[in-house]
A protein has these predicted regions:
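Short, well-ordered secondary-structure micro-motifs
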Residues: 18, 45-49, 108-109, 131-133, ...
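Glycine-rich, Arg-bearing micro-motifs that act as flexible, cationic patches
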Residues: 112, 118-140, 158-161
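A short acidic, glycine-rich active-site loop
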Residues: 57-78
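Small/aliphatic-rich secondary-structure junction motif
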Residues: 1-63, 90-95, 114, 154-157
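A structural motif corresponding to the C-terminal end of an alpha-helix
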Residues: 79-95
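Charged docking surfaces used in two-component/phosphorelay signaling
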Residues: 98-106
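Short, structured motif recognition centered on aromatic/hydrophobic residues
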Residues: 6-7, 25, 33-35, 79, ...
Length: 161
């Protein structure tokens, strides 16, 4: 039924909750898995810097996003190398990608380009203001994906939990 799964990860333990589900589906159907960690595109970083987004260096006339983008790419590759071994140890065929771009759009595009037949990802379970402020990559992927999407809900932890 499924021969190729795409699993988007953002580096969080919450996103990694999808791995056990992807592994189970891959083992059941003999499917291969592509792990994808979308990193920031240079033009996105420049736009965020110009807007004064929190945590982004202040925009200046000579802002060069290359070091930030390269560092994020290196971190993403290192992260995925560690994750890949967990799946390979169970006999699942795994590849990785670290494309640059807007997460939801890039996930949908790569799914289409790779011919993946199922996306397995988590949703952080935000609602109301949290969803409005942070948006929802999972929601956008669900609405635009060219294939079924298996969403694993991860509850947001509150202080004291």
């Amino acid at each position: 039924m499924y021969s190729h799964l795409l699993v988007p990860l953002d580096g969080s333990t919450e996103a990694e909750s999808a791995l056990a589900h992807a592994q189970a589906v891959a083992e059941r159907f003999g499917a291969r898995v592509t792990l994808i960690r979308v990193t920031v595109a240079p033009e996105t970083l420049i736009a965020e810097a110009a807007s004064g987004a929190p945590g982004v260096p202040e925009a200046g006339p000579l802002l060069d996003p290359t070091p930030v983008v390269e560092a994020e790419q290196d971190e993403a590759k290192t992260y995925l190398a560690g994750v890949v071994e967990r799946l390979r140890s169970s006999g699942v065929q795994v590849t990785t990608e670290t494309p640059k771009g807007a997460p939801a759009h890039t996930i949908v595009d790569r799914t289409r380009q790779l011919g993946a037949e199922l996306i397995v990802m988590t949703t952080h379970g935000r609602s109301g203001l949290g969803r409005l402020v942070f948006g929802s990559v999972a929601d956008s992927v669900l609405r635009h994906a060219p294939c079924p999407v298996l969403l694993i809900r991860v509850q947001e932890h509150k202080n004291g939990d």
